Swiss-Prot record:
<dbReference type="GO" id="GO:0005978">
    <property type="term" value="P:glycogen biosynthetic process"/>
</dbReference>
<dbReference type="InterPro" id="IPR011835">
    <property type="entry name" value="GS/SS"/>
</dbReference>
<comment type="similarity">
    <text>Belongs to the glycosyltransferase 1 family. Bacterial/plant glycogen synthase subfamily.</text>
</comment>
<feature type="binding site">
    <location>
        <position position="16"/>
    </location>
    <ligand>
        <name>ADP-alpha-D-glucose</name>
    </ligand>
</feature>
<protein>
    <recommendedName>
        <fullName>Glycogen synthase</fullName>
        <ecNumber>2.4.1.21</ecNumber>
    </recommendedName>
</protein>
<keyword id="KW-0320">Glycogen biosynthesis</keyword>
<dbReference type="Pfam" id="PF00534">
    <property type="entry name" value="Glycos_transf_1"/>
</dbReference>
<dbReference type="GO" id="GO:0009011">
    <property type="term" value="F:alpha-1,4-glucan glucosyltransferase (ADP-glucose donor) activity"/>
</dbReference>
<dbReference type="Pfam" id="PF08323">
    <property type="entry name" value="Glyco_transf_5"/>
</dbReference>
<dbReference type="GO" id="GO:0004373">
    <property type="term" value="F:alpha-1,4-glucan glucosyltransferase (UDP-glucose donor) activity"/>
</dbReference>
<keyword id="KW-0808">Transferase</keyword>
<dbReference type="InterPro" id="IPR013534">
    <property type="entry name" value="Starch_synth_cat_dom"/>
</dbReference>
<comment type="function">
    <text>Synthesizes alpha-1,4-glucan chains using ADP-glucose.</text>
</comment>
<comment type="pathway">
    <text>Glycan biosynthesis; glycogen biosynthesis.</text>
</comment>
<keyword id="KW-0328">Glycosyltransferase</keyword>
<dbReference type="InterPro" id="IPR001296">
    <property type="entry name" value="Glyco_trans_1"/>
</dbReference>
Amino acid sequence: MKKILFVASESVPFIKTDGLADVVGSLPKYINKNNFDIRVILPNYMSIPRQWKEKMLYRTHFYMNLNWRTQYVGVLEYQYEGIWYYFIDNEFYFAGNKPYGNIYEDIEKFAFLSKAVLTCLPVLDFRPDIIHCHDWQTGLVPVFLHDSFQKNEFYHGIKTIMTIHNLKFQGVWDKKTVQDITALSEYYFSPDKLETYGDANYLKGGIVFSDYITTVSDTYAHDITMPFYGEGLDGLMRARSDCLCGIVNGIDYEEYNPEFDPFINKPYNAKNFRKEKIKNKRALQQELGLAKDDKAFMIGIVSRLIDQNGLDLIDCVMEDICAEDTQLIILGTGKDRYENLFRHYARKYSSRVSANIFYSNEQSHKIYAACDAFLMPSLFEPCGLSQLMSLRYGTVPIVRETGGLVDTVEPYNQHESTGTGFTFKNYNAHEMLYTIRFAKEIYQDKKREWNKIIDRGMAKDFSWKTSARKYEELYESL
């Protein structure tokens, strides 16, 4: 039986800021327990809700050197849904009301986490065959493993996998500070290792020293070898392309199930959605103060309101989107520019636009269930989970052809009656607007055809089962 250790900065249900937490919290449940002993290690943030902290049990503690610093390392544990979770405790690094702070704080925080993870393994009497690292916050794990820990026989032969959820975020800070924090020698700060334009890059270190690299979709794995999407690391990704693959994320089909969803007004399934789904639309219209109109084309957006997600395209044609027979519901927070944009239009067209400038898991479920279409015009999208959730709920995605959206949404072809959503290729506001109008035309004038699109989308399997089998094959190969 192979032993696998997930190392990450967040995981549902304990702490979440984005889709990384969904992946780390869901994937281990679907790995075959007969062949793999899989465990997860996370920071014990002060911001983790009390309901979870009360269930954690003290396991051990020790003191660890981080260069000239001597730091306390506590380890707590909790078994959730059959998976053992370990929590690295240190009030200096993990205090505060949110998991991430300024980059200069996080650089030291996650260097501490990476070294503490490796240091605690003999104390826990758990020697993983593979350490599976997620994003830049864990990028130093393979680096430390290659450096000082190789002097200890316990660590010999441990393999590492680096999963890139978003190459844009790399954990870059000045070399001198990182050297002071990590005590890594000058050997590690060359252009073929951690150094990037004179600074130190945590994610680059993880990519260089990992045994294998994965991204969260096939298309994104190809995209990041190109300059436009490579975020300055495209050369490195090409150099390591023989150890790089894309595995599409899944979603938790137990949580995202319209037939048994406790958050939605009227449960439904692939057989009865034609009659029952509309009841969720009516309920959400009433809840949000929108016009009660069954024929209105209701579009949902659940997103961080940032440039990466294509909000500038929506800004360009917002007036056109807010047509008489269209309703738009937004859920999320982000840049002031976009928050204020949606607030403005919600005031201007109060019966057609609802701006919910916050995040609520319950509200997101209601939007997936109630809306007719779901808009994701991303500039780039490593994988994307929202389109998978919308397909699961029979809400037709309208997406730009990039990254994981290419791999998961099949473009509608009216001549062949195929496809699960509507797509557009170029990052262009009017091309997006044309696609929205085309989707609305099918919805309003060809309802039988629209329902067939929903049928095909709801029949797709984007659960973690398929993705988990691919990860199992990768684990076995290392």
